[in-house]
UniProtKB/Swiss-Prot annotation:
One of its GO terms (biological process) is selenocysteine biosynthetic process. Homodimer. The tRNA molecule binds across the dimer. This is Serine--tRNA ligase. The keyword Cell cycle does not apply. Belongs to the class-II aminoacyl-tRNA synthetase family. Type-1 seryl-tRNA synthetase subfamily. ATP binds at residues 257-259, 273, 344-347. InterPro entries: aa-tRNA-synt_IIb, aa-tRNA-synth_II, aa-tRNA-synth_II/BPL/LPL, Ser-tRNA-ligase_type_1, Ser-tRNA-synth_1_N, SerRS_1_N_sf, SerRS_core, tRNA-bd_arm. One of its GO terms (cellular component) is cytoplasm. HAMAP family: Ser_tRNA_synth_type1. It catalyses: tRNA(Ser) + L-serine + ATP = L-seryl-tRNA(Ser) + AMP + diphosphate + H(+); tRNA(Sec) + L-serine + ATP = L-seryl-tRNA(Sec) + AMP + diphosphate + H(+). L-serine binds at residues 226-228, 280, 382.
Length: 425
């Protein structure tokens, strides 16, 4: 949820944010009206309750002659209080709905526009030049790493098996990511992948993109599309001690996405699938530290990309391509030779206080146990995921169809070269 203080003091800033996202700025006026109506309803109900309390006391002290009139007035006030409380509840519900409808306020400097309006911040390495490159699926099948056919047989489209060295390659990548995280002060976690609706909603994943989420209807639980969700819920309804600096967690989990809006897109291979594995960094910090922490997350992502030795670029994602919770997002996109373009491997988002306000995650101002609780800031960032196999296989392929294993992953895979295997099974 956005900060109501900002809304009331500078509604134009919120309107500008909505416009830069390509979203309806009139929602800001609807929220202002709902806020005013809610406060008026609360005031009316409070006034009537105070009057009712005073009238009740008067009845007890009244003379027999005065009592009938006072009792009638008390009854009338009771009915008015009941009606006012109903009106207050309705106003509160309307306010909450209006509040939830507005996306996070984007940070100054974020490019306006949609998916293609990003700004390129840096380009690292030259695009890999190959004659007649094989795509990652052809390589994966030839090398005995990926089995899409049996994945589809068992589970349907966009499912797969990672087999043999393919499984070791992914496990090595994620172990490398987790090791990097631990070296930089992250607490490693293996979180639950099923969460309650309030946690999924609190992170902003049940809004416009709710159709992307798998729901277990019988248990009213949701399968997470990223461990950002359970890690954001980890400190819900808590007051944190941030006096020693940010709290950093690294979650390793399977992730599940319906890809409901992706019909016909990336149907080949493991670029866009229903299930994958990921190590996700998640940070709680003070709002004042959030932008610096965002740069740190980006730096750790870049370090991981350097370790897998692929060319990539860093982009500042345009406002219209941000999720509702993000105030700014940087993506690292690796070069994919067979597509002759860059594809996203990592994203890191500064969600400012948006998620923490929904989940009631606060910290003590100044670290003082008696300090006033303030809303914390949250950030997240990918440190490694299944999609990285695409960039590794395609950029490190050799003319004979083998693939060189990046040096950092050799200890995990057990070989420097992935070579074609004969038919099995």
């Amino acid at each position: 949820m956005i900060d109501l203080k900002l809304l009331r003091e500078d509604p134009d800033a919120v309107r500008r944010s909505q416009q830069s996202r390509g979203e309806d700025p009139s929602l800001v006026d609807a929220l202002l009206a709902a806020d005013a109506a809610r406060r008026a309803a609360i005031s009316t109900a409070d006034t009537l309750r105070a009057e009712q309390k005073s009238a009740s006391k008067s009845v007890g002290a009244a003379s027999p002659e005065q009592r009938p009139a006072l009792l009638a007035r008390a009854k009338e006030l009771a009915e008015q209080v009941k009606a006012a409380e109903t009106a207050q509840a309705e106003a509160e519900a309307a306010f909450t709905a209006a509040h939830l409808a507005i996306s996070n306020v984007v940070i100054d400097g974020v490019p306006a526009g949609g998916e293609d309006d990003f700004a390129v911040l840096d380009v690292v390495g030259e695009p890999t030049a190959l004659e007649n490159p094989r795509d990652h699926l052809e390589l994966g099948e030839t090398l005995g790493l990926i089995d899409m056919a049996r994945g589809a047989k068992v589970s349907g489209s966009r499912f797969y098996f990672l087999t043999g060295k393919g499984a070791l390659l992914q496990l090595g990548l994620l172990q490398l990511a987790l090791r990097l995280a631990v070296e930089n002060g992250f607490v490693p976690m293996i979180p639950p992948v099923l969460v309650r609706p309030e946690v999924m909603a609190g992170t902003g994943f049940l809004g416009a993109h709710a159709e992307e989420v798998y729901r277990i209807e019988a248990d009213d639980l949701y399968l997470v599309g990223t461990s950002e969700v359970p890690l954001a819920g980890y400190h819900a309804d808590e007051i944190l001690d941030l006096s020693a600096g940010p709290l950093r967690y690294a979650g390793w989990s399977s992730c599940f996405r319906r890809e409901a809006g992706s019909y016909g897109k990336d149907t080949r291979g493991v670029i866009r699938v229903h299930q994958f594995d990921k190590v996700e960094g998640f940070v709680y910090c003070t709002p004042a530290d959030a932008e610096a922490e965002h740069q740190r997350l980006l730096g750790w992502q870049r370090e991981m990309l350097a370790r897998i030795e692929v060319p990539y670029r860093v982009i500042d994602v345009a406002a219209g391509d941000l999720g509702s919770s993000a105030a700014r997002k940087f993506d690292c996109e690796a070069w994919v030779p067979t597509q002759q373009t860059y594809r996203e491997l990592t994203s890191t988002s500064n969600c400012t206080t948006f998620q923490a306000r929904r989940l009631s995650t606060r910290y003590r101002d100044g670290g003082d146990a008696k300090g006033k609780p303030q809303i914390a800031a949250t950030l997240n960032g990918t440190l490694g995921t299944t999609r990285w196999l695409v960039a590794i296989l395609e950029n490190h392929q050799q003319p004979d169809g083998s693939v060189r294993v990046p040096e950092a992953l050799v200890p995990f895979v057990g070989t420097e070269l992935l070579e074609p295997v004969g038919p099995r099974g």
